[in-house]
A protein has these predicted regions:
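Transmembrane beta-barrel domains of outer membrane proteins
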Residues: 1-3, 101-105, 153-157, 168, ...
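Membrane-embedded beta-barrel scaffold of Gram-negative outer-membrane proteins
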Residues: 12, 37-140, 146-148, 170, ...
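Transmembrane beta-strands of outer-membrane beta-barrel pores
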Residues: 4, 15-21, 28-30, 106, ...
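C-terminal beta-signal and adjacent terminal beta-strands/loops
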Residues: 19, 121, 159, 230-239, ...
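Extracytoplasmic loops and strand-loop junctions of Gram-negative outer membrane beta-barrel proteins
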Residues: 79-87, 132-139, 187-193, 236-240, ...
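Outer-membrane beta-barrel strand-turn architecture
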Residues: 2-6, 94, 106-108, 121, ...
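Residues that define the transmembrane beta-barrel architecture of outer-membrane proteins
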Residues: 94-98, 146-150, 199-205, 222, ...
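Gram-negative outer-membrane beta-barrel transporters
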Residues: 110-123, 138-239, 304
Length: 307
């Protein structure tokens, strides 16, 4: 950390290692138990059927062998694979984070600039997904990923600190650098290396303007405030295969408020004035796609009393 002269800010560099504990997928235990029970039942049917066929009198052994082979082929196709108990446990996640940036005061300290670049390298990244049955969620380790990006923020206070302007933007390039699941049960190669990491917006931005005007300390209305803001994010992928996601979206909000005598604050607000419809979360389960969407235009009134 290096402080700039004349109180103009500071330049910093940081390196940190993060750790996220592993654990157990309790919700998937019932799936593995049912898979094991189905497998044992089918193996029992196979063994019993073979014994019955072997005991059929007056049937040539060649015919018995052919009947057993045909039965075995059918049962093999419907018998579940042996459950993999290792899926009950997911490993810890490790992350090395590198960041460099500057906090800089400009225009006689009327404008503050925050700028940062970062790189995060994650090993055994933990990602939540639904269990194969669609009932419950499990955590899996996704190999390695790398996230690089930049964040910039501007803040200015004008008119004797009565007007505050802010603007922020962030860009993140997050991809899997190694996420090879091998060959699936259907024989399909599953390799997500190079795909985007889900749930990470590629772009984020916000801007706001807020004003607070003093009236009189002796009036019933002491101060009057109003402002507006715009926020946006996207695009966002919802799965490791990058098959569906949320495009970039933006919303507009506004508020009007006042501070009254007796330490009472009123704030009338409006959110999503643009009526933008976007998904805040989405997933595939049991052959269907589900999504949770944001609230439509919303209006409200907050009343606060400080005592």
């Amino acid at each position: 950390n290096y402080a700039l002269p004349r109180g103009l800010g500071n330049i910093y560099v940081s390196v940190a290692k993060g750790y996220r504990a592993g654990g157990y997928n309790i919700q998937s235990y019932s799936d593995l138990s049912q898979q094991l029970l189905r497998r044992q039942m089918m193996l029992g049917v196979r063994q019993y059927s073979e014994q019955v066929i072997r005991q059929i009198p007056h049937m040539p052994d060649a015919v018995k062998d052919k009947a057993i082979a045909g039965m075995t082929g059918v049962l093999d196709r419907v018998t579940p694979q042996a459950p993999d108990a290792s899926t009950l446990y997911y490993k810890p996640e490790y992350t090395w984070s590198y960041e460099a940036g500057i906090h800089h005061n400009l225009a006689d300290k009327m404008l503050q600039l925050d700028l940062a670049v970062f790189c995060m390298k994650t090993h055994d990244q933990q990602i939540a997904r639904f269990a194969q049955s669609g009932m419950g969620r499990v955590m899996v380790n996704a190999g390695r990923s790398r996230s690089t990006g930049v964040e910039v923020g501007l803040r200015s206070q004008l008119a004797h600190d009565r007007l505050t302007l802010t603007a922020n933007y962030g860009y993140t390039h997050a991809k899997f650098t190694r996420y090879d699941l091998g060959t699936s049960a259907s024989g399909t190669r599953v390799d997500y290396t190079g795909n985007r990491v889900p749930f990470v917006p590629q772009h984020t931005f916000s801007a706001s303007a807020d004003a607070e005007l003093p009236v009189s300390p002796d009036n019933f209305v002491r101060t009057f405030a109003f402002g507006a803001d715009v926020k946006g994010a996207g695009s966002i992928m919802w799965d490791e295969a990058n098959t569906f996601g949320q495009k970039f979206y933006a919303t507009l909000g506004a508020h009007v408020g006042a501070t009254l005598a007796g330490n009472v604050q009123l704030n009338l607000w409006a959110r999503n004035l643009t009526g933008t419809r976007y998904a805040t979360f989405a997933f595939d389960s049991m052959g269907h796609r589900f999504a949770q969407y944001t609230a439509p235009r919303s209006f409200g009134l907050d009343v606060k009393w400080h005592f």
